[in-house]
């Protein structure tokens, strides 16, 4: 019995040591996965497009009171049919704990926050803006300072995951801002994200990280179009290219996600060509400002510009493959 007790004591010691070590490791990381909270908030979501609609519906599904805003009245009506709410901006601002901006760019973000009918002047002190658009880090810092003048908190919080993850409330967020901003936004973050990377206590790093992601994503999509059409030019079936390369070292998430769109001849815009003119433009502007050469990003941007010039700007970004196909005199698969 003494031996058994001794063995139990040793095992207990090691279990405690492992638990303590694990807790220290978790405390040291700045990546937080979603934990559902019971706190319910009033949330205003601006931009009910492919991403914003999913964000708004995820917040609604979590039990929050959600106002939806979009220049497209049909999108607002669609959200109302899901159980969302609509109000005048001043009214929504006065009662909102959180404002989530999921609009296209920095100009739209600035307008919905501080324009003629901007919402920030109507928000209560201590409420928070979660700004999800891809913008330059300098603009993120400027918007945070303007919010601070109204005693409104600001999270520089670009998102990734596409419309599917948005609808599932499982986005990845690259966020930076004060501890108070994170705390004020937490119930909303629990509803719309799977993982939140906390990248600093001021605005800017979140947008800088998103620029890194967009550089890679844009280059990978352009590379997908080039590789797939190159294979077709050599007489290889497009579907077989996707099947084989997806299991090889040369694959990428973007190849596996976008190449099937080309194989199916389906260019329904989940993420449009025009998005990349903006996002890679931001990447190159930021790079230029820091005297950093980004030739791959520049080359990818030229392909997206060419696609837009061919009238493909509103199509899915996989349509960049059409630029390569046209130059090579190839015919891509047609929609089934």
Predicted regions and their residues:
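Active-site-proximal catalytic alpha-helix in oxidoreductases
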Residues: 168-176, 197, 203-234, 243-257, ...
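Rossmann-fold NAD(P) dinucleotide-binding segment
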Residues: 90-102, 106-152
């Amino acid at each position: 019995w003494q031996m058994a007790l001794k063995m139990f004591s040793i095992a207990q010691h090691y279990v405690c040591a492992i638990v303590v070590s694990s807790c220290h490791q978790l405390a040291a990381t700045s990546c937080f996965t979603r934990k559902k909270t019971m706190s319910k908030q009033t949330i205003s979501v601006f931009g009910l497009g492919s991403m914003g609609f999913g964000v708004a519906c995820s917040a609604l599904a979590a039990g929050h009171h959600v106002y939806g805003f979009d220049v497209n009245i049909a999108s607002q009506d669609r959200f109302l049919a899901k159980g969302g709410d609509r109000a005048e901006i001043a009214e929504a601002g006065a009662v909102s704990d959180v404002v989530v901006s999921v609009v296209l760019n920095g100009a739209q973000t600035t307008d919905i926050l501080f324009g003629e009918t901007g919402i920030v002047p109507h928000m209560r002190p201590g409420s928070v803006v979660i700004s999800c658009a891809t913008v330059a880090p300098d603009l993120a810092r400027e918007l945070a300072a303007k919010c601070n003048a109204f005693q409104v908190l600001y999270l520089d919080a670009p998102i990734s995951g596409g419309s599917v993850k948005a609808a599932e409330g499982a986005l990845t967020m690259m966020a930076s801002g004060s501890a108070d901003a994170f705390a004020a936004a937490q119930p909303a973050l629990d509803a719309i994200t799977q993982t939140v990377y906390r990248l600093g206590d001021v605005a800017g790093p979140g947008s800088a990280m998103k620029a890194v992601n967009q550089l890679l994503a844009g280059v990978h999509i352009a590379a997908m179009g080039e590789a797939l059409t190159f294979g077709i030019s050599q007489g290889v079936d497009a579907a077989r290219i996707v099947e084989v390369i997806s299991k090889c070292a040369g694959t990428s998430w973007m190849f596996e996600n976008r190449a099937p769109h080309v194989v199916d001849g389906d260019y329904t815009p989940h993420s449009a060509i025009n998005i990349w003119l903006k996002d890679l433009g931001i990447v190159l502007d930021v790079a230029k400002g820091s005297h950093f050469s980004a030739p791959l990003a520049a080359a990818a941007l030229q392909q997206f510009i060419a696609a837009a010039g061919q009238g493909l700007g509103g199509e899915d970004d996989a349509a960049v493959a059409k630029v390569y196909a046209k130059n090579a005199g190839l015919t891509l698969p047609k929609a089934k």
